[in-house]
Amino acid sequence: MGPESAGAIPGPASYGKGGPLTVTDCNVLLGKLHPEHFPSVFGPNGNAPLDVEVVRKKFTELSKYVAQQTKKSQMDEISMAEGFLKIAIENMANAIKKISIQKGYDVTNYTMNCFGGAGGQHACHVADSLGITNVLIHPYAGVL
């Protein structure tokens, strides 16, 4: 997502191609994306499922690194993924605020319309952050 996206290649860590941790990986680790519902097209040979264990390992490594750098106790990987996801959702909501609320628009009566492959994963949380009560997820949102 955004200018520093992992893109499709190498993609998120869960793609098994050496990519960095991403918001997608947060959703994989938190059980919001289920590898068994995806085709086995990942990994170096393009025949593996999404890799939950590599995501767990990378979050554990990151948690150790953060604990060492901050001299605080190590966070578990689930809490870290939840924290990153909350930040990502607030960043999405803030982008909408910048083009609407800060210009005087009251978005609470609008309908949140999402698109893109991950739009449906985050639309309800972003809408909650903005006080929007209606969300439209088009059946072809992933290809819009």
Regions found by a protein language model. Name each.
Residues 1-144:
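N-terminally biased helix-coil "hinge/interface" segments that flank
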